[in-house]
């Protein structure tokens, strides 16, 4: 195999969750709220015939750009916990735009704080997820991703009834520090996701910032500022949750959770699902055998030591951090949520 082909395999963006072999004619339904940059990993690796996508983006310019990209159905709405009128602050860096005012005394401790300064304000009318569902503008959603710079909890509150009945998973941006005035923090979002929606936390992709400094090159990690948290429907309560649905819907939800756990690399979760005592209530024996073979195949990786080697790990970890990308030296983030298979390695 030549070098270029090897590199092509190494950086192949295909995701093993979206194989036609395990789609069984079903599609996972994704709701992406705050979709400015388009569909993110791992969902961006799915084929059109395995995924239905609804993108929600209140910024009219960005919503038009998403429509032109034809990634899915675009709803140019602002979502909240009630139908009301809000002011959207369009900041110097559009990705920091929010209905919350920036907390400048906090942000000015770090570099490049001016990107949070508002250059324009627009008035937006908000809707709630529960209202959209009642009006049939959205149907059965399996997975939701929310990234709206502080407004995540309000959106979850506005869709509590719908989300409790439909979600198998949630990826949501959470803040550990008050980047915006009066915004909810991780503890608030986490409590709501667990207690109100019945989900459980599985992973967090964390982002760190370093205080402004000009004389010395500091260590890589700074203060934990924000992250992307992944929540999944618990195995322990899954059968009870699914049993309240009709046969078609419960089978779809079971399949969506299987695909989601594979997509994020939680194969132990996938295995627990398909080998559970209740799995055959929601998947036939033939499809179950296909899934078992698929998991057996994709779980294989390069494991030279059955329990690892702490000395070699430490050496490679030091080398890895020496080359880790940063944002101008003062901000860095973990690569992704969950585990991702690259070439013959799970990372």
For the regions a protein language model found, what residue spans apply to each?
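Phosphate/nucleotide-binding beta-alpha loop and adjacent structural elements of enzyme active sites
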Residues: 1-347
């Amino acid at each position: 195999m030549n070098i270029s082909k090897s590199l092509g395999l190494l950086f192949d963006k295909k995701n093993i969750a979206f194989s036609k072999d395990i789609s069984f004619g079903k599609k996972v339904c994704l709701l992406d709220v705050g979709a400015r940059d388009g569909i993110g990993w791992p969902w961006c690796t799915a084929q059109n015939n395995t995924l239905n996508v609804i993108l929600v983006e209140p910024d009219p310019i960005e919503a038009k750009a998403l429509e032109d990209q034809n990634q899915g159905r675009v709803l140019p709405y602002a979502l909240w916990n009630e139908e009301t009128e809000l002011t959207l602050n369009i900041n110097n860096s559009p990705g920091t735009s929010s209905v919350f005012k920036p907390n400048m005394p906090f942000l000015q401790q770090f570099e490049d704080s001016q990107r949070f300064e508002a250059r324009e304000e627009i008035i937006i009318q908000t809707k709630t997820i529960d209202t959209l569902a009642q009006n049939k503008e959205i149907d059965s959603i399996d997975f939701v991703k929310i990234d709206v710079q502080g407004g995540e909890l309000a959106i979850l509150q506005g869709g509590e009834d719908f989300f409790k009945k439909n979600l198998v998973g949630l990826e949501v941006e959470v803040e550990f520090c008050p980047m915006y005035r009066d915004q909810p923090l991780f503890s608030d979002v986490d409590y709501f996701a667990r207690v109100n929606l019945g989900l459980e936390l599985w992973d967090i992709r964390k982002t760190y910032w370093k205080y402004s400094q000009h004389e010395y090159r500091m260590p890589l990690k700074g203060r934990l500022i924000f992250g992307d948290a992944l929540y999944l429907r618990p195995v322990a309560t899954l059968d009870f949750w699914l049993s309240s649905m009709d046969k078609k819907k419960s089978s779809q939800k079971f399949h969506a959770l299987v695909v989601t756990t594979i997509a994020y690399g939680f194969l132990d979760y996938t295995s627990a699902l398909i080998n559970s005592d209740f799995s055959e209530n929601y998947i036939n024996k033939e499809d179950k055998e296909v899934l078992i073979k698929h998991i057996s195949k994709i779980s294989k990786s390069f494991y030279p030591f059955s329990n690892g080697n702490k000395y070699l790990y430490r050496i490679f970890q030091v080398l890895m951090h020496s080359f880790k990308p940063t944002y101008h030296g003062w901000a860095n983030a973990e690569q992704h949520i969950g585990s991702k298979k690259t070439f013959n390695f799970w990372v």
